[in-house]
Curated annotation (Swiss-Prot):
Similarity remark: Belongs to the MCC family.
Gene of this entry: USHBP1
Protein name: Harmonin-binding protein USHBP1
Phylogenetic classification of the source organism: Eukaryota, Metazoa, Chordata, Craniata, Vertebrata
Quaternary structure (record): Interacts via its C-terminus with the first PDZ domain of USH1C.
Pfam families: USHBP1_PDZ-bd
Organism field: Homo sapiens (Human)
Coiled coil listed as a keyword: yes
Annotated GO MF terms: PDZ domain binding
Chain residue ranges for the region called Disordered: 1-113, 138-172, 228-256, 396-416, 540-583
Tissue: Highest level of expression in heart, and moderate to low expression in skeletal muscle, kidney, liver, small intestine, placenta and lung.
Biased composition, class Basic residues, residue ranges: 1-15
Length: 703
């Protein structure tokens, strides 16, 4: 047998507590019993199987426990006859006792260095499970015989006499059901133990990782420090089996107190007994979830690398397109400059054509003057010539003309002759030709900017990548489309500028209206105060008139009585006060003052009415002016928008005409080039001397 199968035999001397099972001892006894007759040689499974074999081994161990219970039941059939009613409860008790026995077995395992060693406990548990599995594998297949014999013995002992086979079968089924229940309980206990073992194993792995990190840090720190022979000796002693004494371990560290304080991890490594078998443990296989997670991580890494490459490719394509755009912008500026030069050259050519036409008309009129031709043609030609010369002078000098054109209706002395006008026209044509010669017009379009050789390949690669993936392809804009977009953008910008100008004008009108309203505010406040004062005066006058009407039936004597009925001044006042009171309430003066106040009130009312009418007139005039200004502003805006639209239409037409003229000019240039080439070839052919004829030979005749 192997060493793992015979390892738990040292526990035979120990007696298990009463009421508990010793699975290791029983498994070893079963292995010896199985190997007594025929000693087969088998190799237990290695420990490196890890957690993947714990489940099947627990089931096998559960079945082995079931076989051992069968043996005990076979051995003690007489006792079962005596205690038949207690049989159904016994498996449950054994099932509850099995985990306790396993726990007690764990507790009875001697620790390595005085500390709980989880690895040794795990090894002992695995060895016991392997022994149970080996015993179950080598158990003879005829194990149903003892069961049947046990069943028949139980049936013979428990029955009163002869019973049918149905009763024995029922009892056998009940016994097997009880055994199945016990096995399930044992399996559940084993599963709980497996879960605890897995949890402890995870904790050990975490601790192992932390220890490895600390060991790495310690190694780095040792590499930074000076080498010491005592340190290496102490590390060698600490990494052994742990049997060296504490004095031998303490001596080198006492000489290096600072080093031990700087590195307390060595003491921990030496005192921790579980670190002695870190190197002996095999690598645990990863779970399927970990494999799936690793595969997903690898896939994500690959996707990230692909995206990085694609990003770099896109940046390269972008740089290439940026360079091409810069080149296109330069070409566009060059084309605009060429278009401007062509436009100016065309304008000069038109002016030259018009000048030649006027000069031809002058020549015809001058030549026909002797034949009594009408003078109207000559005058019209001279007017056209002076108009062209005036345009040139206006173009050359934007200010006032220093040399005004002479009037043809003047005297014959001041009037220039047609020859002088023709001379001026010829000089004008010469100046136009000189200006046209200053324009640099290319007969052929310049070379276009050649694209970079890497740009099409990169673009093709990007298009291929985008074609394989979901999403739109890269936009490919032509030059005409870019120009159209540019023209549309310029038109939109012009519209926005026009709207901005309109908004600014509206804002200015609103500001003026606000200023006018602010100026009218104080006038309205003054008018409101005047109206309030008038209303108060009218209310006071109405009260006085109502009092006068109520006492109108009385005579003047009543008024005198009312004046005399005023209360006298108490205490015998002086005569001065009495005179003042008499003067204050004199009826004649009071009537005069009332008449004067009434006249003033009427005058003020008339002035107020006149001011109100003037204010209304001013307000009406202001409203009329504002309405007129608003209408004028709207008309101006409409006219401006119409002018803008007309300008755009004219600009488009001019552009179309310019394109047509450019095409015609290109065709004419091509035709002229062909004609010039034909003429040059003809001239060369005519100017080339003929070779002399060879002398005639005998027999030849001159034709």
């Amino acid at each position: 047998m192997s060493a793992r199968a015979t390892r738990p035999r040292s526990r035979r001397g120990r007696h298990a507590p009463p009421g508990e099972l010793d699975p290791v001892a029983e498994s070893s006894e079963e292995v010896e019993a199985a190997s007594g007759s025929s000693k087969p040689s088998f190799a237990p499974p290695p420990v490196s199987s890890g957690l993947e074999q714990l489940g099947p081994m627990e089931e096998v161990s559960g079945q082995g426990l079931g076989s051992r219970t069968d043996k005990k039941m076979d051995g003690g059939s007489g006792r079962e006859l005596a205690s038949a009613p207690e049989v159904p409860h016994k498996p449950a008790v054994e099932a509850h006792q099995a985990p306790e026995a396993a726990l007690q077995y764990k507790e009875t395992v001697p620790p390595g260095n005085g500390a709980p060693d989880v690895f040794q406990t795990l090894q002992h548990t695995l060895s016991s499970l392997e022994a149970a599995a080996a015993a179950w594998r080598h158990q003879p297949p005829s194990h149903s015989g003892p069961m049947e014999f046990e069943g028949t013995s139980e049936g013979g002992a428990g029955s009163l006499g002869k019973q049918e086979g149905a009763g024995s079968c029922q009892r056998e089924a009940a016994r097997l059901a009880e055994r199945n229940a016990w096995l399930r309980l044992a399996l559940s206990s084993r599963e709980d133990e497996l879960v605890r073992t897995q949890a402890s194993l995870e904790a050990i792995r975490a601790e192992k990782e932390t220890l490895q990190k600390e060991v790495q840090e310690l190694q780095d720190s040792l590499l930074r420090l000076e080498p010491c022979p005592h340190l290496s000796h102490n590390q060698a002693g600490g990494s052994g089996s742990g049997s060296s004494s504490s004095e031998a371990d303490r001596e080198p560290w006492e000489t290096q107190d600072s080093f031990s304080l700087a590195h307390p991890l060595l003491r921990r490594l030496r005192s921790h007994s579980s670190t002695q078998i870190l190197g002996s443990l095999p690598n645990q296989p990863l779970s399927p979830e970990m494999h799936i997670m690793e595969a997903q991580m690898e896939q994500l890494r690959g996707s990230i690398e692909k995206l990085k490459c694609f990003n770099r490719l896109l940046s390269a394509v972008l740089q290439g397109y940026k360079g091409r755009c810069e080149g296109l912008s330069m070409q566009l500026g060059q084309r605009e400059a060429e278009a401007t030069a062509l436009h100016l050259a065309l304008q000069y050519s038109e002016h030259c054509e018009e000048a030649y036409r006027v000069l031809l008309a002058l020549r015809e009129a001058d030549s026909g003057a002797g034949d009594e031709a009408p003078m109207s043609d000559l005058q019209a030609a001279e007017k056209e010539a002076w108009r062209l010369l005036a345009q040139e002078e206006a173009a050359m000098d934007a200010g006032a003309q220093q040399n005004p054109q002479p009037s043809p209706e003047g005297s014959s002395v001041d009037k220039p002759t047609p020859q002088e006008v023709a001379f001026q026209l010829r000089s004008y044509v010469q100046r136009l030709q000189e200006r046209r010669s200053l324009m640099k017009i290319l007969s052929e379009p310049g070379p276009t900017l050649a694209p970079m050789p890497t740009v099409p390949r990169a673009e093709a690669m990007v298009q291929a990548i985008l074609g394989t993936q979901a999403g739109p392809a890269l936009p490919r804009l032509e030059k005409t489309q870019i120009q159209q977009d540019l023209v549309a953008a310029r038109e939109a910008l012009a519209d926005l500028m026009l709207r901005l100008q309109l908004v600014r004008r509206e804002k200015r009108g609103l500001e003026l209206r606000e200023a006018a309203l602010r100026a009218l505010g104080p006038a309205h406040v003054l008018l409101l105060e005047q109206l309030r004062w008038e209303r108060a005066e009218l209310q006071a006058g109405g009260a006085n008139s109502s009092g006068g009407h109520s006492s109108g039936g009385g005579s003047s004597g009543d008024e005198e009585e009312w004046y005399q009925g005023l209360p006298a001044v108490p205490g015998g006042t002086s005569g001065i006060d009495g005179g003042q009171v008499g003067r204050a309430w004199d009826p004649e003066k009071l009537a005069q003052e009332l008449a004067a106040s009434l006249t003033r009130t009427l005058d003020l009312q008339e002035q107020l009415q006149s001011l109100r009418r003037e204010l209304e007139q001013v307000a009406q005039k202001g409203r009329a002016r504002r309405s007129q200004s608003a209408e004028l502003n709207r008309d101006l805006c409409k006219a401006h928008s119409a002018l803008v639209l007309a300008f755009r239409g004219a600009h488009r037409k001019q552009e179309e005409q310019r394109r047509k003229l450019e095409q015609q000019m290109a065709l004419m240039e091509a035709q002229q080039a062909e004609e010039v080439a034909v003429l040059e070839a003809t001239a060369r052919a005519l100017g080339k001397p003929r070779p002399p004829l060879p002398p005639p030979q005998l027999g030849d005749t001159f034709l």
